[in-house]
């Protein structure tokens, strides 16, 4: 084997030719001699010649065999060489990707070793961003601060991405009339990421039958984001080249707030039905038909789809279960349990009557105008959906959730355009209370811990809205509570509320303490609801956020009887179990339990901090921030 590999190529070729020539001569000679010996002439040869030629023929035969063996050896050597070459090639082909993979792994290891987690405490990177370089992390975090969601990821996702169909399977069996009203979709935005708006538009176009979708109207409430100017205009032109006249954009010259932006879109709409949406949404399949069919059945109904949630960090969709939209006495929105009347229908596709709506709604365009559209006096954000819901219910319409219409809504981690919405929420809540809540409006003041008189909050001129209420001959808020939202329970026995201080140290206030937990504490005074206290003429002392609902209980200050420290117990349960929850109190006086006769007081612990105790009454007295009617002396601290 090694011998053949070492032969020079020219020598190898020459040797091969020589052997071939010799073989030809041998065979030729052998043939001649054989012919002479056994040929057709059959001549007799002398004996010595006969022997001589026989020996030659024998030798030639041996030589032929040897040469044949040599030829076979050469063939075998060549085949072995080919096998070796083939094996080497195959080995190289197999090893090459392994070596490449090992090299890649080494590079990745080096890469990970050099990368740092630049923002270990950022909520953006809890479940996302493991493979980002440091430069990518910085870019993603900057966009997160700017928009309140993962705009970096949004910019990489397809605009026409697929999201899970979250409808109940029975919704897929429903059929709708072939003739349905036309639809105007209104998208409200301020300083959204461009890719978010584009994805909303794309989902609407792709998942709404073109015969139903008349227009998409974008309302920009004075964005400062540069890409929402020229770049957005260019995108709209591209959409309109493919779908002529479908998209329109209206830009406010100044910030007007959510309610007025929705009114701007409504005023520009021309279809039979308007759907007013946030721009950070993706509509799901079959979202429009249930809306249009229901409004075609009843023009006085305001409807809302079911929300699903798009996570702010991963953009994954979380399915939300069907619920109705409610609110508390601060007019904060929330989800409430489904009404028993709907459950008894045994039809999961049926519309659900709801006390309120969230931020997305659809309505007959003319009916929405007849009842006054949205209250343009609501500023910035908050309460406008509750105001509309109260007006619709009290003025002859109804509000419903449609189980078979679903929209995915992108949650924000924070609202960068308004980091503190408290002032706007308070102001808007008082405006709603003054217009629509009649003798129960005080509950909003109590919940927000605002003085009933001289609140110092300007909620705007409400005369035109009061005139509208009179014109529409609207029902009372008491009717609404009894017939639509019996969950809310107004209270009329509260005579003192707000922060409560012991005059030993007016820098600390009574506080509900850690949650979960039921131990009240003394803590540095602040304006959050954990320090709200509500004293009733009947003797209860609520501590913490005011609930005043049928399905949940406020927490009452309780004397446990033997222990030194007071507790907070659910009022309804405590009353049922005859716990010591009733107190005598007047502003500037002691707080005395009616049963145990012990006083609520405070003392310093070993660390010098004030702690609450129940003990024999000394000279300690308490003040409460606000009083109602003629109870005690009016205070405002």
Swiss-Prot record:
Gene Ontology cellular-component annotations: Golgi apparatus; Golgi membrane
GO molecular function: carbohydrate binding; metal ion binding; polypeptide N-acetylgalactosaminyltransferase activity
Chain intervals for the UniProt region annotation (Catalytic subdomain A): 180-294
The protein's annotated pathway: Protein modification; protein glycosylation
Membrane topology summary: Single-pass type II membrane protein
Cofactor(s) needed: Mn(2+)
Gene Ontology BP, a term: O-glycan processing
InterPro entries tied to this protein: GalNAc-T (IPR045885), Glyco_trans_2-like (IPR001173), Nucleotide-diphossugar_trans (IPR029044), Ricin_B-like_lectins (IPR035992), Ricin_B_lectin (IPR000772)
Segments in the Cytoplasmic topological domain: 1-6
Residues involved in substrate binding: 221, 255, 412, 417
Enzyme Commission no: 2.4.1.41
Region Catalytic subdomain B, annotated ranges: 351-412
Main location: Golgi
Annotated glycosylation sites: 85, 107, 160
Pfam family, one: Ricin_B_lectin
Residues where Mn(2+) binds: 278, 280, 409
Compartment annotation: Golgi apparatus membrane
Domain notes: There are two conserved domains in the glycosyltransferase region: the N-terminal domain (domain A, also called GT1 motif), which is probably involved in manganese coordination and substrate binding and the C-terminal domain (domain B, also called Gal/GalNAc-T motif), which is probably involved in catalytic reaction and UDP-Gal binding.
The protein's role, per its UniProt record: Probably catalyzes the initial reaction in O-linked oligosaccharide biosynthesis, the transfer of an N-acetyl-D-galactosamine residue to a serine or threonine residue on the protein receptor.
Protein name per its UniProtKB record: Probable polypeptide N-acetylgalactosaminyltransferase 8
The organism of origin for this protein: Homo sapiens (Human)
Source species taxonomy: Eukaryota, Metazoa, Chordata, Craniata, Vertebrata
């Amino acid at each position: 084997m090694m011998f053949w590999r070492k032969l020079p190529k020219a020598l190898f070729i020459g040797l091969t030719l020589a052997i071939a020539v010799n073989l030809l001569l041998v065979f030729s000679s052998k043939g001649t001699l054989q012919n002479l010996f056994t040929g057709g002439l059959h001549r007799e040869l002398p004996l010595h010649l006969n022997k001589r030629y026989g020996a030659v023929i024998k030798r030639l035969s041996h030589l032929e065999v040897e040469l044949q063996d040599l030829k076979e050896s050469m063939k075998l050597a060549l085949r072995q060489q080919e096998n070796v070459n083939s094996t080497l090639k195959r080995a190289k082909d197999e090893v090459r990707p392994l070596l490449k993979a090992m090299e890649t792994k080494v590079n990745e290891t080096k890469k990970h070793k050099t990368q740092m987690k630049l923002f270990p405490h950022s909520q953006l990177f809890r479940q996302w961003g493991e493979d980002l370089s440091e430069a990518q992390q910085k870019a993603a975090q900057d966009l997160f601060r700017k928009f309140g969601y993962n705009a970096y990821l949004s910019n990489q996702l397809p605009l026409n991405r697929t999201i899970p169909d979250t409808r109940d399977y029975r919704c897929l069996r429903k059929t709708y009339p072939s003739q349905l009203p036309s639809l105007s979709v209104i998208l409200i935005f301020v300083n959204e990421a461009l890719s978010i708006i584009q994805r909303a538009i794309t989902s609407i176009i792709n998942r709404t039958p073109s015969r139903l979708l008349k227009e998409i109207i974008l309302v920009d409430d004075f964005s400062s984001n540069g890409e929402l100017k020229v770049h957005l205009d260019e995108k709209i032109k591209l959409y309109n080249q493919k779908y002529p006249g479908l998209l329109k954009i209206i830009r406010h010259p100044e910030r007007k707030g959510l309610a007025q932006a929705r009114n701007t879109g409504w005023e520009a709409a021309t279809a039979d039905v308007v759907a007013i949406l946030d721009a950070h949404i993706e509509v799901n399949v079959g979202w429009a038909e249930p809306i249009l069919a229901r409004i075609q059945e009843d023009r006085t109904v305001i409807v809302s789809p079911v929300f699903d949630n798009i996570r702010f960090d991963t953009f994954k969709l979380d399915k939300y279960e069907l619920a109705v939209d409610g609110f508390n006495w601060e007019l904060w929105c929330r989800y409430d349990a489904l009404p028993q009347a709907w459950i008894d229908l045994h039809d999961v596709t049926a519309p659900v009557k709801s006390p309120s709506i969230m931020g997305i709604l659809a309505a007959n365009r003319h009916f929405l105008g007849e009842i006054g559209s949205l209250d343009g006096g609501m500023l910035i954000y908050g309460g406008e959906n509750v105001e509309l819901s109260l007006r619709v219910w009290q003025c002859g319409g109804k509000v419903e959730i449609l189980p078979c219409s679903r929209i995915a809504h992108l949650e924000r981690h924070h609202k960068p355009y308004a980091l503190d919405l408290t002032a706007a929420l308070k102001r808007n809540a008082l405006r709603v209370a003054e217009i629509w809540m009649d003798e129960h409006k005080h509950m909003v003041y109590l919940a927000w811990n605002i003085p009933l008189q001289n609140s110092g909050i300007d909620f705007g001129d409400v005369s035109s809205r009061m005139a509208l209420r009179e014109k529409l001959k609207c029902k009372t808020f008491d009717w609404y509570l009894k017939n639509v939202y019996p969950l809310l329970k107004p209270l009329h026995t509260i005579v003192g509320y707000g922060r409560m201080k012991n005059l030993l140290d007016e820098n600390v206030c009574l506080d509900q303490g850690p949650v979960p937990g039921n131990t009240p504490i003394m803590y540095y005074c602040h304006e959050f609801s954990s320090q709200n206290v509500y004293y009733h003429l009947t003797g209860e002392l609520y501590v913490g956020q005011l609930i005043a609902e049928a399905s949940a209980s406020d927490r009452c200050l309780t004397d446990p009887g033997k222990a030194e420290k007071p507790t907070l117990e659910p009022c309804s349960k405590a009353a049922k179990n005859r716990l010591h929850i009733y107190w005598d109190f007047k502003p500037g006086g002691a707080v005395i339990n009616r049963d145990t006769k012990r006083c609520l007081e405070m003392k310093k612990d070993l660390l010098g901090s004030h702690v609450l105790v129940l003990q024999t009454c000394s000279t300690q007295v308490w003040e409460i921030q606000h009083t109602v009617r003629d109870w005690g002396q009016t205070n405002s601290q």
